Amino acid sequence: MTQPLRVGLAGLGTVGGGVIKILDTNAALIERRANRPIEVVAISARDRSRERGIDLSRFAWVDDATQLAARDDVDVVVELIGGADGPALTLARETLDAGKSFVTANKAMLAHHGLELAGLAEIKGAALKYEAAVAGGIPVIKGLREGAAANVIERIYGILNGTCNYILS
């Protein structure tokens, strides 16, 4: 059997809890498509005692999200904390500096520190994935990067944000 991709998840609000539920509910399908299982192994959130409607007892709990980056049993860190600076940025830097892949939906952090983080990821040979932060999660980044590889795209203008779409509708 192929080794699982081991995930450290920071942030257990609506989105973080949803990630765990989706990975549980669709485990077999995800494993077939990814050619390996994806398992959350460690988690972190501000309030350990908050009821979230899911069983978290099977995961290692860390009180400081930045500890996820240093864990030997974590291959990729998913950040769903939010905020341009503070714990989210520290976690991003430490994860990428450790040569581990980093996934985020954090628009604010990417707007303020995206170039820095992309540079660090490139230097360390890690992946920085932020598809969920763009266009309400519509997979446009991968499509543009891979599907338009022979074209030079200088910029794209428009409202491609799920929050704006929700407000405007």
What is the predicted function of each stretch?
Residues 99-101, 162:
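Glycine-enriched alpha-helix->loop->beta-strand junction motifs that scaffold or abut catalytic
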Residues 61-63, 70, 78-79, 103-105, ...:
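General beta-strand structural signal in soluble alpha/beta enzymes
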Residues 146-169:
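Conserved anion/nucleotide-ligand pocket segment
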Residues 14, 135, 139, 151, ...:
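Charged, alpha-helix-enriched surfaces in structured cytosolic catalytic cores
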Residues 1-98:
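N-terminal glycine-/serine-/threonine-rich beta1-alpha1-beta2 phosphate-ribose binding loop
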Residues 44-48, 134-136, 159-165:
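Glycine-rich beta-alpha junction loops
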Residues 83-98, 105-146:
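Rossmann-fold NAD(P)-binding glycine/threonine-rich loop
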